[in-house]
Amino acid sequence: MTPILISGFSVAVPVAIATDLLFATISKVLGVAIHGRAGRVDWKVTRALWSGSLPGVLVGSLVLVGLVTQGATNWLMWLIVVFVALTGWTLLRRGFQAPVTMRASQAPAPRWLAPLGGAGIGLGVSLTSVGAGVLGMALLVRISPRDTQPQRLVATDLLHAIPVAMIAGISYTFSGLVDWGLLGTLLLGSLPGVVVGSLLSGRVPGRVMSLALGIILVGLAVVLPLT
C-alpha cells in the first residue's frame, strides 16, 4: 500500500510508511483469525522467525524515527523502490516456477536461517512497510517442511507479520507520523476484502495471483522514482 499512497495520493513517505504499517496490522489480524480458527498456523516456525524479526523491527523503528527527527528521509524513497522491486521479482519468480520444483530439491534449512532472515525482514519492513508478506513467504517456503500445505504457509506468514507491523506502527504513532483519517478510509474499503480473500484462499490459482501482483509491483518500482 505504501507505494500507492506515495505515487497515487502524494502522501509523504514517512507518513505513508507509518499509516500502512498500522493498516497492515489490523487487516492481518482479521485474516489470521480466520486461518487460525482452522488450525493452520505453524507456531514453531513462527517463533523462530520472531526471534529475529522482532529485534530487527525495533532497531529499524528507532532508525526511522531518528531520521525523521533530523529531516534526513530522502533516501527512504529509494529503499522502498528496492524493496518493492525485490518483492515483485519474488512474486514473478514464484509465478513462473512450478510448485513441485520449488520444494523437490530443497535441502533442510540451517537453524540460523529463520532468525537471520526474520531480522532482515523486520529491519526492512520497519523502514519501508514493504515485503513482510511476500519476502516472509519466500523464507517460509525455504525453512518449512516439504509437505507443508500452502494454507498453512499463508496462515503462518500472516501471524508472523502481525507483531512486526504492530511494533513499528505503535512506534510511529507516538512519533505523530500516522494519518488517522487516511487509515480509517483504507480500513473501510479493505476489511470486507480481507474477509472474502481469507475465505477464498486456495481457490484462486496461486501462480496467477503471483504473476499479477508481481507485474503490478515491478511497475510501481519503475513509477515511484518519477513521482
PLM region descriptions:
Residues 20-24, 50, 157-161, 182-187:
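Short hydrophobic/aromatic, small-residue-rich stretches within specific transmembrane helices
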Residues 2-8, 13, 34-127, 138, ...:
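Juxtamembrane transmembrane-helix boundary motif
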Residues 111-171:
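Structural signal for alpha-helical transmembrane segments and their flanking helix-loop junctions
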Residues 11-22, 42-48, 145-158:
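Membrane-interface alpha-helices at helix entry/exit sites of multi-pass transporters
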Residues 22-31, 53-59, 63, 159-167:
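Membrane-embedded alpha-helical segments of transport systems
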Residues 1-2, 133:
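Extracytoplasmic
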